[in-house]
Amino acid sequence: MSHSPTDAHWQQPVTAGAVTALVGFTSSFAVVLAGLRAVGATPAQAASGLLALTLGFGVLIIALALVHRVPVTLAWSTPGAALLVSTGSVEGGWPAAVGAFVVTGLLIALIGAVPALGALVARIPTEIAQAMLAGILLQLCIAPFVALADAPGYVAPVIVAWVVASRIAPRWAVPVALLVAVGAIVVAASRSGESLDTASLVPRLEWTTPTWTWPAIVGIALPLTIVTMASQNLPGAAVLRSFGFSVPWRSSVVSTGLGTAVVAPFGGHAMNLAALSAALAAGEEAGPRERRWIAATSAGVGYLVIAGAAGLVVALADVAPPGIIEAVAGLALIGALVASLQGAFAHERHRTSAGLTFLFAASGVSLLSVGAAFWALLLGLAVRATLERD
């Protein structure tokens, strides 16, 4: 059966959008899950967070694509979730973390609405921001090898699958590793006699009343805002521009900021412009340039469909051998770690400030109940101003 050129023009962007959603979710949900659990979420609250975020940016992707006719795709903040892992529990527990998520959303919306604030964020030196991110990512990226020592029979196949897939089909490396991890979880559960909690397979939105504490605002909201802007929104906009599209910056950033504030009480930490998966819907594989907005719309619909899997992935994580989910999360972030290290140490002149920022962020120490990322940023800026004046 033959297809008309018109059919092909529709099929190509629709398929690209579906791939965008599938890769976007499967390649990073483990990081988000680890981040939410690290700051105090129960399994049900973590599932609610995954569901709220996926529904939230799914709806916003469709709206932005239809209004602007540009292949804008959104995502959760994967580096932001890594930040949550490195921060851990804060004073006030999960409700305080949720309060920090609300503040993060409002700050992002304010940055999008006020050009001067956006310019201020953009002035944070690249090497300092990248060094802070690299320090945040380091412990997560070490996790696969720690897990390998603890459970080699389960973790080794995951790492091998990731390496082989990285050689053959890099885009699918993490989904393939995840598939192998699911197989390992099933084998482990059958040996131990554990079974999935069927009641938790259907995800539900769970409301958490936010509380606000200064340690959570300073230790989570401020670094999360900076990481999300510097590592997601700015690179995401750059990807779209690289394909010749005009970026609807204000509407994208304001809507994702307000969207974050809305989904935060349900466990969502931050949503933003997609960076890692942005090229899937904006590139040539998504069809003729004037139809690539359809790929974004398709991605939004895909995310709405995939959102229903939030309960399943959390239930699987609950019966997983220790370390296997963290191993998948770490493998998913290795590329981001390498890129951030390259950005941090690209210029010899700034390596001292970048190095100290990286080491402090990687240390994970908490001062005055505020996590390492905030202090690493301050230290890096202070050292840069002191040692590297023009």
Question: Where are the model-predicted features located?
Answer:
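C-terminal ends of transmembrane helices
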Residues: S2-P5, F57-V70, L107-A119, V160-R167, ...
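Membrane-embedded helical hairpins/re-entrant loop segments and their flanking transmembrane helices
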Residues: S2-W10, A34-L60, L222-W293
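Hydrophobic, membrane-embedded alpha-helices of multi-pass small-molecule transporters
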Residues: V14-G24, A173, S190, L205-P235
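Transmembrane helix-boundary motif of multi-pass solute transporters/channels
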Residues: G17-L53, L64, V70-G88
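Transmembrane alpha-helix interface/packing and boundary motifs in multi-pass membrane proteins
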Residues: V19-L22, V59-V72, G259-H269, G364-L368
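Extracellular loop-to-transmembrane helix junctions
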Residues: A41-L64, G88-I111
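Short, non-helical or kinked segments that cap or interrupt transmembrane helices
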Residues: H68-A81, V121-A129, W172, S246-S251, ...
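Membrane-embedded alpha-helical modules
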Residues: E91-E194, S298-D390
